[in-house]
Amino acid sequence: MVSSQPKYDLIREVGRGSYGVVYEALVRRTSQRVAVKKIRCQAPENVELALREFWALSSIQSQHPNVIHMEECVLQKDGMVQRMLHGSSSVLYLPLVETSLKGEIAFDPRSIYCLWFVMDFCDGGDMNEYILTRRPSRRTNTSFMLQLSSALAFLHKNQIIHRDLKPDNILVCKSRDGVDEPTLKVADFGLSKVCSSSGLNPEEPANVNKSFLSTACGTDFYMAPEVWEGHYTAKADIFALGVILWAMLERITITDTHTKKRLLGGYVQRGAQVVPVGEALLENPKLELLIPVKKKSMNRRMKQLLHQMLSANPQERPDAFQLELKLIQIAFRDYTWET
């Protein structure tokens, strides 16, 4: 980072997205490996995505092993560097908030604004790469299902709706001994929403399953039918996770039209056309999904749970806490996937 006494040494670039670059870095004082994401704030949409991620991760008062942890956020303007805190009245921070709210740059465009997020470093790529480069493993599937349901329950408990759950946004940290299953971390909170309390008791935490959102966002193959309509709650995250788990268990893949990369994702086939599950259910809520596609890919309880998670009616889906409990029961009470 740009400072008279840098805290981090950037080692190499490990990823590049639409609004930022991610580096592997070392903490100078401890030699700890971290990931540093640099976001250039030259466009209002970049600022909004960055601030959404910052607000979501900084709102969490505790850590969870399966949710990416943000160590700190540093704001850089030209030669000035300042640690950014949520709710700050800093003259550097407020123009970014104004930019996000108005949708237009609220600072001198000649200034170079950057945000630096310091987060956990994950050395195993993303879930998509990990699953598709290895043979199917019941042990891995079970571990990943439990980790992801635990992460989602934690986020919803903290009033955060992710809104873009997909394998590309789930990072993998390899186990140190190479024997245990890797640790997953839900990441990329640029589209997330922190639900605030309202009504008669503002001190009471918001119920994410009753907080309705209207901005249709996410990635089409993981979007719930109600998201396409623009009227949804946290149950949309349950649907997205249902698509992910279904695709993981049966190795169902789609092809990214831009990169030609194979991705884990469920779909409905219409002749030669591949249609996102949510879009198909929006058009026909009574559509019966073919789960499982492969006869012995899952047991009866898992089949029933996936049908519930992928229901066209959000009220018929379990909430994140019910889902976590159901998956624990499936993992530890069922000894075979064929019953």
Curated annotation (Swiss-Prot):
It is an enzyme of class 2 (transferase). PROSITE patterns: PROTEIN_KINASE_ATP, PROTEIN_KINASE_DOM, PROTEIN_KINASE_ST. The active site is at residue 164. It comes from Xenopus laevis. It comes from the Eukaryota. It is found in: Nucleus. The gene is pdik1-a. This is Serine/threonine-protein kinase pdik1l-A. Keywords: ATP-binding, Kinase, Nucleotide-binding, Nucleus, Serine/threonine-protein kinase, Transferase.
